[in-house]
Curated annotation (Swiss-Prot):
Keywords: Cell inner membrane, Cell membrane, Cobalamin biosynthesis, Magnesium, Membrane, Transferase, Transmembrane, Transmembrane helix. It is found in: Cell inner membrane. One of its GO terms (molecular function) is adenosylcobinamide-GDP ribazoletransferase activity. The gene is cobS. This is Adenosylcobinamide-GDP ribazoletransferase. Its EC number is 2.7.8.26. HAMAP family: CobS. InterPro entries: CobS. It catalyses: alpha-ribazole + adenosylcob(III)inamide-GDP = adenosylcob(III)alamin + GMP + H(+); alpha-ribazole 5'-phosphate + adenosylcob(III)inamide-GDP = adenosylcob(III)alamin 5'-phosphate + GMP + H(+).
Length: 262
């Protein structure tokens, strides 16, 4: 394969990842199949970087003319519109299943139900409120830090979520599941590129903030995996969405705490 063909292949995989995780239209020449979607996992972090960057731009463009709370809300709205609430939906389904089911089978069945339950509604409301409040506090501390936090959190949280695919068992047997192709064998190249995207955005941060966030994310990933194993024996697409949302919120927490210390 020539260098040009290799670059074309990587761009193609990035666009597949973008089409899977966002509502951004893909070019007509991009063809999606299970094999491409499987390999596209390497670029999930970069998709997060794109979503975070666009959200941050909206925040930076509006924060001089609008109250911090409104600018943050607009930035969050952009993120939701870009992804179609994909991860938020996973968070709600996961909490409905984990909160309402007694056995792993019950939990998986509830998670597949499209109706929103009380556990899911509470989780969704609290998650959105936490994100808004934490970002407002970061904006009042320093607007540049708040915008950078959006970029970092959207990227790192997706790296944490996608990395679960590489070590854990996919527990749904449904062949029609959108997440099924992701559950197939993942290569070392996918993992290394995924991790590299997370390391890349840490350059936005000062040394202590970057190190603190890295250590917390490693610990959080381990905790999430332990919970998923105990609840359903592995992961599903919904739980990956929940992992992303939780990791994003924790990112804001860490950056706010470290920012107040520095």
């Amino acid at each position: 394969m020539s260098e040009r063909e290799s670059w074309h292949k990587e761009i193609d995989l990035f666009l597949v990842a973008m089409g899977y995780f966002t509502r951004i239209p893909m070019p007509k020449w991009v063809e999606v199949d299970s094999d491409k979607l499987n390999k596209a996992s390497r670029y999930f972090g970069l998709v997060g970087l794109l979503v975070g960057l666009l959200s941050a731009i909206v925040f930076w463009l509006t924060q001089n003319w609008l109250p911090a709370g409104v600018s943050v809300l607009l930035a969050m709205l952009v993120g939701v519109l870009l992804t179609g609430g994909f991860h938020e939906d996973g968070l709600a389904d996961t909490f409905d299943g984990f909160g309402g089911g007694w056995t792993a089978e019950d939990k998986l069945r509830i998670m597949k139900d499209s109706r929103l339950g009380s556990y899911g509604a509470l989780a969704l409301i609290l998650a959105l409120l936490l994100k808004w409040q934490l970002l407002v506090e970061l904006a009042l501390y320093d607007p540049v830090v708040a915008g950078s936090a959006l970029i970092v959190a959207h990227t790192v949280s997706r790296v944490v979520s996608a990395s679960i695919i590489f070590s854990e068992k996919y527990v749904r047997d449904d062949e029609t599941s959108k997440s099924k192709p992701l559950s197939q064998h993942q290569g070392i190249n996918e993992l290394l590129i995924l991790i590299a995207s997370g390391v890349l955005v840490l350059l936005f941060l000062k040394g202590l903030a970057a190190l603190s966030l890295l250590l917390v994310m490693i610990g959080l990933r381990r905790l999430i995996i332990v919970i998923f194993r105990r609840q359903i024996g592995g992961y599903t697409g919904d739980t990956l969405g929940a992992a992303q949302q939780i990791a994003e919120i924790v990112c804001y927490f860490v950056l706010l705490v470290v920012g107040n210390i520095l």
